[in-house]
């Protein structure tokens, strides 16, 4: 009766599932035609159910009507993305030209906002980036490099593929940096700023393409406050490196610290002695993979220059997260007085580094005679 009603044989659930499986197999086989090696590997994993992409693709297709048109679009888009990743086009990762995400999106889809945060295709790209990083064996570097700063994990993952999520407001403020490009060539621009004795804002796109970075005497002094940094730069004469975090570290500054650690640079960091400043200092020490010192952030330093600025009880609760043995004593002194301490009060002490660096240079010259 049902066959008469539907004017043909009735398809059961088993037959329907088999038919859909055949359609998906044909769709995946079609997507492989003309795809590059990486994209073919990705499609093979989907076919063999070795990744979470097939359930995701099925879900997206059902949401769009379930006629496989959306599935075909997503597979085609996935192939185009994987074939066009900057990291796949570069001869070596260190020489990889980083691309802005909006430019990449425009080239792939015609829409610079196609992969914006919060969009479905933006989530799809994120899944492809994570798959790529896992399959190319660079996952450890991406996740381990975010220690203390998990918010930057996504940016680091994208950078592994050669994509920059943000650059306009992402720069490192530094003086005394020597750098080499991915090909090993000396970065003439950074060399020029060093010779002129001037600080420079270094964009993320530049740092991402560097193979190495160093500074005079392999000593880098970092401050949190821009006004303190400006005064130090005014007295600076290329005897060391100077850097300004300007509050919470940017991704670009962390990348620069990675390169400095690889070159054996010794870091001295000075921040405000308030709850936020102590936590930033603690995170930076945990992050840096080289020799790291707190610079005038001890309990004794705090007692020398405590201000009249009160710290609210809510902010004082943040001090419970200070676990570093050196900073814990400072946090206890801060909690006891309830007053903050700001870097501007220590300018005279900070400026002593230049006298010490000058004395060190004179002493080394004397020994060299």
Regions found by a protein language model. Give the residues of each.
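Acidic beta-strand-to-loop metal/phosphate-binding motif
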Residues: 265-274
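Nucleic-acid enzyme cleavage-core boundary/entry regions
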Residues: 1-244, 249-262, 276, 282-283, ...
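Structural alpha-beta junctions
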Residues: 265, 287-293
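Hydrophobic/aromatic beta-strand patches that form the interior of the parallel beta-sheet core
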Residues: 221, 243, 268, 293-295
């Amino acid at each position: 009766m049902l066959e008469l009603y539907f004017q043909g044989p009735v398809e059961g659930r088993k037959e329907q599932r088999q038919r859909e499986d055949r359609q998906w197999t044909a769709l995946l086989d079609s997507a492989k035609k003309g795809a590059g090696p990486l994209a073919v590997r990705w499609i093979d994993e989907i076919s063999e159910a070795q990744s979470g992409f097939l359930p995701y693709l099925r879900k997206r297709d059902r949401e769009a009507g379930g006629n496989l048109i959306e599935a075909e679009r997503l597979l085609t888009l996935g192939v185009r993305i994987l074939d066009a990743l900057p990291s796949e086009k570069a001869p070596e990762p260190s020489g990889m030209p980083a691309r802005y995400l909006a430019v990449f999106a425009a080239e792939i889809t015609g829409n610079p906002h196609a992969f914006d945060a919060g969009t479905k295709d933006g989530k799809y790209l994120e899944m492809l980036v994570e798959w790529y990083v896992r399959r190319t064996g660079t996952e450890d570097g991406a996740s381990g490099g975010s220690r203390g700063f998990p918010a930057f994990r996504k940016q680091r993952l994208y950078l592994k593929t050669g994509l920059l999520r943000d650059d306009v407001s992402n720069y490192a403020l530094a003086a005394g940096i020597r750098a080499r490009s991915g090909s090993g060539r000396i970065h003439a621009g950074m060399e020029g700023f060093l010779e002129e004795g001037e600080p420079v804002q270094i964009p993320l796109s530049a740092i991402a393409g560097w193979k190495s970075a160093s500074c005079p005497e392999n000593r880098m002094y970092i401050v949190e406050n821009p006004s303190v940094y400006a005064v130090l730069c005014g007295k600076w004469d290329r005897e060391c490196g100077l850097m300004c975090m300007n509050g919470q570290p940017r991704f670009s500054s962390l990348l620069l610290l990675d390169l400095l650690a690889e070159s054996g640079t010794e870091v001295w960091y000075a921040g405000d002695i308030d709850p936020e400043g102590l936590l930033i200092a603690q995170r930076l020490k945990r992050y840096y993979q080289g020799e790291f010192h707190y610079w005038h952030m001890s309990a004794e330093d705090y007692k020398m220059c405590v201000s009249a600025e009160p710290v609210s009880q809510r902010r004082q609760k943040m001090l419970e997260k200070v676990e570093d043995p050196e900073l814990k004593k400072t946090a206890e002194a801060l909690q006891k007085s309830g007053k903050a301490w700001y870097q501007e009060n220590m300018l005279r002490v900070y400026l002593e580094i230049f006298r010490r660096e000058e004395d060190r240079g004179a002493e080394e010259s004397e020994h060299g005679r």
